[in-house]
Amino acid sequence: MKAAVLVFPGSNCDRDLAVAIEKICGTKPLMVWHQESELPDDLDLIAVPGGFSYGDYLRSGAMAARSAVMPAVIKQAERGVPVLGICNGFQILTEAGLLPGALMRNAGLSFICRNVGLEIQNTTSPFLRLYKKNQKIHLPVAHHDGNYTADEATLDQLEDEDRVALRYTESVNGSARNIAGVLNKKGNVLGLMPHPERMIEDAHGGKDGYNMFASLMQVMA
């Protein structure tokens, strides 16, 4: 599997994500600097990592979404290439228009860094096929702006089209309807605030994030 991990000024989870992809998928991903304007045509995955791109100035992900590399990401996503945005990556994908809604300041106005309970809502996305519907998992979060917000019509549409990927099992940050991750209409773009790459082996406290990458491998096989 050929994967690319984007790197922006302020990214700090890009190496963790690259290690997870290499460990599970067996190939070392390309590390793509944000100033690149092209991506290889034969990619099987584009991963947008967590961190604080551009220091979260203006809004989280707002400046990164306007980086030189993003038109190529949008083009590949429209072709059906799987795109995974984690934490700041999720924020970037919403700012770029690849996913609906926005990530606002946490309801408690504080940075949240802990493991949280999640419930799998969708099992048809290439990232989620090895999970079971309504399966309970735990993944770590580490964010200040993870409060998912959208208007009621958009939220209803996400529910009706089975595009809510994961839901918190409790109110973590004030997210509308406890949404932790959403999909685009095709199902090939996933954005989520929790960090699956930080929980892929028992030494990390569990392997609940492993199947998010293994699912994609199964689809590509």
From Swiss-Prot:
Q: Name one GO molecular function term.
A: phosphoribosylformylglycinamidine synthase activity
Entry-linked InterPro entries: Class_I_gatase-like, PRibForGlyAmidine_synth_PurQ
Example GO BP: 'de novo' IMP biosynthetic process
Tell me the ranges covered by the Glutamine amidotransferase type-1 domain, including all copies: 3-221
Record's keyword terms, sorted = ATP-binding, Cytoplasm, Glutamine amidotransferase, Hydrolase, Ligase, Nucleotide-binding, Purine biosynthesis
Q: What is its EC number?
A: 6.3.5.3, 3.5.1.2
> Part of which pathway?
Purine metabolism; IMP biosynthesis via de novo pathway; 5-amino-1-(5-phospho-D-ribosyl)imidazole from N(2)-formyl-N(1)-(5-phospho-D-ribosyl)glycinamide: step 1/2
User: Which residue windows are coiled coil?
Assistant: none
Q: What is its main location?
A: cytoplasm
Catalyzed reactions per annotation:
N(2)-formyl-N(1)-(5-phospho-beta-D-ribosyl)glycinamide + L-glutamine + ATP + H2O = 2-formamido-N(1)-(5-O-phospho-beta-D-ribosyl)acetamidine + L-glutamate + ADP + phosphate + H(+); L-glutamine + H2O = L-glutamate + NH4(+)
> Active site at which residues?
C87 (nucleophile), H195, E197
Cytoplasm listed as a keyword: yes
Q: Where in the cell is it found?
A: Cytoplasm
* GO CC term (a single one): cytoplasm
Subunit notes for this chain?
Answer: Part of the FGAM synthase complex composed of 1 PurL, 1 PurQ and 2 PurS subunits.
Q: Which PANTHER family match?
A: PHOSPHORIBOSYLFORMYLGLYCINAMIDINE SYNTHASE SUBUNIT PURQ
Role noted for this protein: Part of the phosphoribosylformylglycinamidine synthase complex involved in the purines biosynthetic pathway. Catalyzes the ATP-dependent conversion of formylglycinamide ribonucleotide (FGAR) and glutamine to yield formylglycinamidine ribonucleotide (FGAM) and glutamate. The FGAM synthase complex is composed of three subunits. PurQ produces an ammonia molecule by converting glutamine to glutamate. PurL transfers the ammonia molecule to FGAR to form FGAM in an ATP-dependent manner.
- Quote the HAMAP family the UniProt record gives: PurQ
In Swiss-Prot or TrEMBL terms, this protein is called Phosphoribosylformylglycinamidine synthase subunit PurQ
What organism does the record attribute this protein to?
A: Zymomonas mobilis subsp. mobilis (strain ATCC 31821 / ZM4 / CP4)
Please name the taxonomic classification of the source.
Answer: Bacteria, Pseudomonadati, Pseudomonadota, Alphaproteobacteria, Sphingomonadales
* Gene this protein is translated from: purQ
